[in-house]
Swiss-Prot record:
It comes from Danio rerio (Zebrafish). Ligand for members of the frizzled family of seven transmembrane receptors. Can activate or inhibit canonical Wnt signaling, depending on receptor context. Required during embryogenesis for extension of the primary anterior-posterior axis. Regulates convergent extension movements and hypaxial myogenesis during gastrulation via activation of non-canonical Wnt signaling. The keyword tRNA processing does not apply. Disulfide bonds join C87-C98, C137-C145, C147-C165, C221-C235, C223-C230, C292-C323, C308-C318, C322-C362, C338-C353, C340-C350, C345-C346. This is Protein Wnt-5b. GO terms for biological process: ameboidal-type cell migration; angiogenesis; canonical Wnt signaling pathway; cartilage morphogenesis; cell fate commitment; cell migration involved in gastrulation; chondrocyte differentiation; convergent extension. The lineage of its organism: Eukaryota, Metazoa, Chordata, Craniata, Vertebrata. Palmitoleoylation is required for efficient binding to frizzled receptors. Depalmitoleoylation leads to Wnt signaling pathway inhibition.
Length: 363
């Protein structure tokens, strides 16, 4: 009897350890590189702990890539930070506003759900890495890449030169794919399982984010000639402003496709009346949780205490933002520049004005 009980306790303990370790794998993410400053390779101190062993949230494959490309890690962190900031900007007027909760899981349990919001977060963070690494190549910060070697566009006028130092989007795309997707490709879940569906979802959204940066990159040119006559132009490939990438992905979020896993272990549309998603589209497998109220299980932070716009009928309006709970009004001082004048030559001088304004927060 005692032996059976001990075996039962042992089995329960092992089960709990396995479950907790799986949760830890989900919770820890390379996104945490955005939350903690990364030491640049040239700043290493003799006898200090190696860089890659200090970084939390990396999978086994990502840690190997870290060891091979240590000078890239700063820019992966910068890319993750860029993605998080853009996520917070795009969702600043939504019930879920891309809030970070800690330095390890970054977004908390809300990312355990395969929702539209999770899809956007994966896409925009992958896009951030492409953006940061591509630019670092152009600036000569990385040992394995340089200026863009993209082919001359066919529609570029013959008398325009092609060959300025452009952003190396090809390299940024390839490296981001290897690094960001490494965690997903290491997983070996049973084909057709819920976990397998989530892995496929993550890979699709990572690719959509990378493709957004790749496809939005455009040709930039500079004029040469006497007195700016522009008798000659030099052109190169340039990244789009990341705000444009964020807006593009936000549109993809609004039109994201609901998917499910089929018997063959592939994602398929829940509603066959819609066109299947392309490589540039976002997909999700779970409905979004209720973001109105705080919920420890789903990771929702709720909207209590959020600022709202009393006169707006949109998502930032008090009626929708506060989920019908009502709102409180208070007065606060607003400081801003005013009475600005241009002085010759050449600066603008402003006064600092203070006004008392009404603000509204959700109950």
């Amino acid at each position: 009897m005692d032996v059976r009980m001990n075996q039962g306790h042992l089995l329960l303990a092992v089960t709990l350890i396995v479950c907790n370790s799986q949760l830890l794998v989900v919770a820890n993410s390379w996104w945490s590189l955005a939350m903690n400053p990364i030491q640049r390779p040239e700043m290493y101190i003799i006898g200090a702990q190696p860089l890659c062993s200090q970084l939390t949230g990396l999978s086994q494959g990502q840690r190997k890539l870290c060891q091979l490309y240590q000078d890239h890690m700063v820019y992966i962190g910068e890319g993750a930070k860029t993605g998080i900031k853009e996520c917070q900007y795009q969702f600043r007027q939504r019930r879920w506003n891309c809030s970070t909760v800690d330095n390890t899981s970054v977004f908390g349990r809300v990312m355990h759900i395969g929702s539209r919001e999770t899809a956007f977060t994966y896409a925009v963070s992958a896009a951030g890495v492409v953006n940061a690494v591509s630019r670092a190549c152009r600036e000569g910060e990385l040992s394995t890449c340089g200026c863009s070697r993209a082919a001359r566009p066919r529609d570029l006028p013959r008398d325009w030169l092609w060959g300025g130092c452009g952003d190396n989007v090809n390299y940024g795309y390839r490296f981001a794919r290897e690094f960001v997707d490494a965690r997903e490709r290491e997983k070996n879940y049973p084909r057709g399982s819920v976990e397998h569906a989530r892995t496929l979802m993550n890979l699709q959204n990572n690719e959509a984010g990378r493709m957004a940066v790749y496809n939005l990159a455009n040709v930039a040119c500079k004029c040469h000639g006497v007195s700016g006559s522009c008798s000659l132009k030099t052109c190169w490939l340039q990244l789009a402003d990341f705000r444009r990438v964020g807006e593009f992905l936000k549109e993809k979020y609004d039109s994201a496709a609901a998917m499910r896993i089929n018997r063959r272990g592939k994602l398929e549309l829940v509603n066959n009346r819609f066109n299947p998603p392309t490589g540039e589209d976002l997909v999700y497998i779970d409905p979004s949780p209720d973001y109105c109220l705080r919920n420890e299980t789903t990771g929702s932070l709720g909207t209590q205490g959020r600022l709202c716009n009393k006169t707006s009928e949109g998502m930032d309006g008090c009626e929708l933002m506060c989920c019908g709970r009502g709102y409180d009004q208070f007065k606060t001082y607003k400081h801003e520049r005013c009475h600005c004048k241009f002085h010759w030559c050449c600066y603008v001088k402003c006064k600092r004005c203070t006004s008392l304004v009404d603000q509204f927060v959700c109950k």
